[in-house]
Swiss-Prot record:
Residues 7-156 form the Ferritin-like diiron domain. Keywords: Iron, Iron storage, Metal-binding. Belongs to the ferritin family. Stores iron in a soluble, non-toxic, readily available form. Important for iron homeostasis. Iron is taken up in the ferrous form and deposited as ferric hydroxides after oxidation. It comes from the Eukaryota. This is Ferritin, lower subunit. The keyword Iron applies. Fe cation 2 binds at E59. It comes from Aquarana catesbeiana. GO terms for biological process: intracellular iron ion homeostasis; iron ion transport. One of its GO terms (cellular component) is cytoplasm. One of its GO terms (molecular function) is ferrous iron binding.
């Protein structure tokens, strides 16, 4: 059944939103996996766990807001299976942060692609919706992850045995 509120909302935008919702839920799932790992009793890096749990919640909230937007525009939400994270264990915090950065860049690219579709389909409402807060927050998260990776690498070079502990306590704490 066609929506009575749908106006200037192209099917390509609708499909792109559904794909982005799935990617956001997958990202949330990956971050939750990281948080769970760092909260384990044999890892015990609670601020890493908190940092990744916050990323997980943020991605989940974004997915839910995208769903709400889809409904506001008269689109139809088609939830898909959420892919399991590729791994459950992480060698160290640096590896997890590097994986998170790669993931966040892929999320940002998906948002940029969706923005391009909306612009191509002359949907200024959707381009505006994506620009703030999603694209700006995504860039901020990429910067934060990059800064954390740089700081942890510097610590690692001067305090290899204590780097994760010090970073967990003083940077993330």
């Amino acid at each position: 059944m066609e929506s009575q509120v749908r106006q200037n909302f192209h099917q390509d935008c609708e499909a792109g939103l559904n794909r982005t919702v799935n990617l956001k839920f997958h990202s949330s799932y990956v971050y939750l996996s990281m948080a769970s790992y760092f909260n384990r009793d044999d890892v015990a890096l609670s601020n890493f766990a908190k940092f990744f749990r916050e990323r997980s919640e943020e991605e989940k909230e974004h997915a839910e807001k995208l769903i709400e937007y889809q409904n506001q525009r008269g689109g139809r939400v088609f939830l898909q299976s959420v892919e399991k994270p590729e791994r459950d264990d992480w060698a160290n915090g640096l590896e997890a942060l590097q994986t998170a950065l790669k993931l966040q860049k892929s999320v940002n690219q998906a948002l940029l692609d969706l923005h391009a579709v909306a612009a191509d389909k002359s949907d200024p409402h959707m381009t505006d919706f994506l620009e703030s807060p999603y694209l700006s927050e995504s860039v901020e998260t990429i910067k934060k992850l990059g800064d954390h990776i740089t700081s942890l690498k510097k610590l690692w070079s001067s305090h290899p045995g204590m780097a994760e502990y010090l970073f967990n306590k003083h940077t993330l704490g």
